[in-house]
């Protein structure tokens, strides 16, 4: 059972205030290092988290963990009575026409030409990372292009797929007590410099998608290196945002 599962709300999962522990525990690290090509199910990933105590009582703090998103993915799959990837395709990818975006469900499934992700070794040299997307599950097992990412940034930031009241609720937030760099974390997305969207990092890739609801501008940034001690796309975005904001609307 999820620690405090009888008290946690769906909103608390989405705004990172549930207290759910992170699934990337020492036990998970040991299992992954022993077999980097092992295919993990979402249930298996969640099980690593469930072996740990809750970080805090629901609603007490806001600490970002990918376990929250894994749990939401399971809720979505149960609600629609479909595998999570099928729900994403049917209700997001296809309606938005994201023809270059995929939810990856297998190890090394990324087809066609694509960048290799790198992390820095202890000696400072970049090392290529494998493409085991099953390690990420609903928390990040997707591939895309900058063009599609810009389209997604607009849809996410404007609430194109949601009722207006739902989108307004999603814009309510507060700073994280611990987690990725955001000015505030909202409901399933974050804010930076008055823009809303999300960042991500995994397997040597770092990304950012942001949308300005006032101007309608969207920005997507992707890099094929991580473990630099800071999220570089966020650093770039903070420099880019004032420039884009200064451009008069067309």
Where are these regions (language model features)?
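Secretory-pathway/luminal and periplasmic proteins that interact with or process carbohydrate-rich
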Residues: 2-9, 18-25, 95-105, 175-184
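Mid-domain, small-residue-enriched loop/turn segments at the edges of structured enzyme/sensor domains
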Residues: 9, 67-68, 100-106, 114, ...
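Alpha-helical scaffold elements that line and support the substrate/ligand-binding pocket
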Residues: 13, 50, 63-97, 148-155, ...
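Active-site-proximal loop and beta-strand segments within enzyme catalytic domains
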Residues: 1-65
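Solvent-exposed, acidic/flexible segments
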Residues: 3-7, 38-42, 61-69, 77, ...
């Amino acid at each position: 059972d999820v620690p405090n599962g009888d008290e946690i709300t769906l909103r608390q999962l989405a705004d990172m205030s549930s207290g759910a522990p992170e699934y990337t525990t020492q036990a998970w690290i040991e299992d992954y290092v022993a077999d980097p090509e092992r295919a993990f199910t979402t249930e298996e990933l969640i099980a690593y988290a469930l072996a740990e105590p809750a970080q805090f009582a629901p609603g007490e703090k806001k600490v970002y963990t990918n376990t929250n998103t894994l749990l939401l993915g399971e809720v979505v799959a149960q609600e629609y009575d479909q595998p999570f990837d099928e729900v994403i395709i049917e209700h997001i990818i296809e309606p938005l026409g994201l023809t270059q975006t995929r939810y990856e469900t297998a190890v090394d499934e990324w087809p066609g030409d694509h960048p290799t992700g790198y992390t820095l070794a202890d000696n400072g040299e970049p090392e290529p990372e494998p493409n085991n997307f099953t390690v990420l599950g609903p928390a990040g097992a997707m591939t895309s292009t900058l063009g599609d990412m810009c389209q997604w940034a607009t849809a996410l930031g404007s609430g194109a797929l949601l009722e207006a009241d739902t989108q307004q609720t999603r814009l309510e937030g507060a700073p994280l007590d611990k987690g990725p760099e955001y000015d505030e974390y909202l409901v399933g997305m974050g804010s930076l410099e008055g823009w809303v969207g999300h960042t991500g990092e995994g397997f040597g890739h770092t990304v950012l998608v942001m949308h300005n609801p006032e101007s309608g501008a969207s920005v997507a940034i992707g890099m094929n290196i991580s473990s630099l001690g800071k999220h570089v796309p966020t650093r770039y975005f903070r420099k880019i945002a004032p420039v884009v904001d200064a451009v008069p609307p067309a």
